[in-house]
Amino acid sequence: MRSPKVKFLTIFTLSILITKMSFASSACFNEAGTMFRIEPNLIKAIALVESNLKKDSIGKNRDKKNNIKSFDYGLMQINQMHIPMLKKRGIIKDERDLLDNPCLNIKIGTEILYKHFSRCGMTWQCLGTYNAGFAMDNQKKRLQYAKKIYIVYTRLNELDNRKALAK
């Protein structure tokens, strides 16, 4: 169990990160949640873990030899494998759209998560596929990722409850 001081610092740090979100981006999480029937705080937790809420974040995925194998873009760290289909559907022109339009990035990431939940059920193990994919040998990575999301998600809900009680 964490000490009260560590718990306070973690919650304090989370509250600072959440303050960084503009009203518009909070509205985007809510809108994406409504569109895909996924709780907005779960989406926010993913964005916090994936990019620390940095809309222009570009992640590099590396293989065991440290070679770059793919890139992830924006708040929700949309993997480049999705770009051809997003272009084909007319949703983006190129990966720059994933960096320049945080609301669009949130909605695309939420749609990807929705498709994963549709495939393997609304479970923490399935949520882990958002980051670690569906490969059988990635089960441990999926659970580790899901645990990170769960911790942040729980803290976001605690903050919301504190705000509600303070009113």
UniProtKB/Swiss-Prot annotation:
Any one annotated GO CC term: periplasmic space
Signal peptide boundaries: 1-24
Protein's cellular compartments: Periplasm
Superkingdom, taxonomy of origin: Bacteria
A Pfam entry, by short name: SLT
Keyword Cytoplasm appears in the UniProt entry: no
InterPro entries on file: Lysozyme-like_dom_sf, Transglycosylase_SLT_dom_1
Family: Belongs to the IagB/IpgF/P19 family.
Gene name linked to the record: pbl
Keywords carried by this UniProt record: Periplasm, Signal
Name under which the protein is recorded: Peptidoglycan-binding-like protein
Keyword Signal carried by entry: yes
Listed transmembrane segments: none
